[in-house]
């Protein structure tokens, strides 16, 4: 028996090593890996106050693994026992988005359409703003390892979207910054606003330099009738095994003369939410990370109850939970995030909207979607 276990152990170890070596080799050749900031850019990043020894830092001490180490996380991801209901049994309900309907709006209307995971279209001040537009079914350069989208289709394709005024990227992980989507959007998007260092990926993928602007925390840009502000998050970055934290990560604030919207990006709970609320709130709506949590990475992703508290911290009137209903990236039931978030929001009397994929949420136009569809 022990001999058999040793043989199995060697086979498993060999398989893991093969996956790692093959993955690194392939990723280093794949354009999806993106680009690298120049030496001059890295020197400039040191002035940001949160870049040290070649890596971006969080505002408070943060570790990637609160239990185990990187190897145990990888082992759990590849071979860990799945939980019940980790993936939906059938495609999720979805409303197809008519591209013509996006053009029908006024400068005063705020409409948000969530596509699943974090990808969302925010129509505000007459502008089309895309948040982390990961609009592909497969993720990353090695799709047989990484999770695929639950639904085989999205509410709309990148090709059918109208002209985009700005794309906002929160960080460079594959489930938020997608090579194929950027390639399809690069010629119809006026501006790409990204955290420090992320511009190198876009340049490598053929986005015109004039369309790319990197923003540090606290930086802002002005479009007619709209202010966009980069604000802190508590996370990490990297698209390979050797470039962790070489680029920054952000949350985002959108301000029109009459409405304000907040997008958390990815990240753990922290005091930055209260600071953002004090500086930029109150918000009419907050799109907040809610999903892909685990006790092994408790400082870089929020529990649903923390999502609700963070929404209160930023002083948002309504919560729209995102970062779920598309990919399985953690060992919890696929609908556990929304069940727990709605329960906690009810307990704390926080309004929450729960649209289906592709269902528009229009502020000030009557009751917001609250159907229990999961």
What are the residue ranges of the model-derived segments?
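Metallo-beta-lactamase
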Residues: 2-147, 154, 160, 195-263, 284-291, 340-358, ...
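Active-site metal-binding loops of divalent metal-dependent hydrolases
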Residues: 133-135, 172, 233-234, 265-267, ...
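Catalytic core of the metallo-beta-lactamase
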Residues: 117-123, 222-282, 298, 302-306
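Active-site metal-binding motif and surrounding structural segment of the metallo-beta-lactamase
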Residues: 48, 145-193, 281-287
């Amino acid at each position: 028996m022990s001999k058999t276990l040793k043989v199995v152990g060697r086979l498993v170890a060999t398989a893991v090593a093969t996956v790692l070596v093959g993955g690194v080799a392939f990723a280093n050749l794949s354009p999806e890996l993106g680009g690298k900031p120049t030496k001059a850019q890295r020197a400039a990043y040191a002035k940001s106050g949160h870049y040290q020894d070649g890596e971006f830092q969080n505002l408070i001490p943060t570790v990637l693994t609160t239990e185990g180490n990187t190897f145990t996380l990888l082992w759990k991801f590849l071979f860990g026992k799945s939980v019940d209901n980790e993936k939906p049994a059938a495609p999720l309900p979805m409303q197809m988005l008519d591209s013509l309907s996006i053009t029908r709006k006024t400068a005063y209307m705020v409409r948000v359409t969530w596509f699943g995971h974090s990808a969302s279209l925010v129509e505000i001040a007459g502008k089309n703003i895309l948040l982390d537009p990961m609009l592909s079914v497969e993720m990353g350069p090695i799709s047989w390892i990484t999770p695929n989208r639950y639904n085989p289709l999205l509410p709309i394709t990148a090709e059918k979207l109208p002209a985009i005024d700005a794309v906002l990227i929160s960080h460079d992980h594959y489930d938020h910054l997608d090579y194929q989507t950027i390639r399809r959007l690069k010629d119809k998007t006026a501006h790409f606003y990204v955290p420090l260092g992320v511009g190198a990926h876009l340049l490598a993928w053929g986005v015109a330099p004039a369309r790319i602007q990197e923003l540090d925390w606290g930086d802002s840009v002005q479009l007619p009738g709209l202010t966009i502000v980069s604000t802190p998050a508590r996370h990490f970055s990297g698209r390979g095994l050797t470039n962790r934290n070489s680029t920054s990560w952000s949350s985002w604030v959108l301000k029109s003369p009459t409405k304000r919207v907040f997008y958390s990006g990815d990240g753990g709970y922290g005091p930055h939410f209260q600071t953002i609320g004090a500086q930029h709130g109150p918000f009419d709506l907050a799109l907040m990370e809610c999903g892909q949590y685990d006790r092994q990475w408790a400082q870089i992703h929020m529990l649903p109850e923390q999502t609700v508290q963070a929404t209160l911290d930023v002083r948002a009137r309504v919560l729209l939970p995102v970062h779920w209903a598309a990919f399985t990236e953690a060992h919890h039931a696929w609908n556990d995030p929304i069940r727990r978030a709605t329960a906690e929001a009810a307990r704390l009397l926080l309004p929450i909207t729960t649209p289906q994929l592709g269902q528009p949420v229009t502020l000030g136009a009557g009751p917001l979607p609250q159907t229990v569809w999961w």
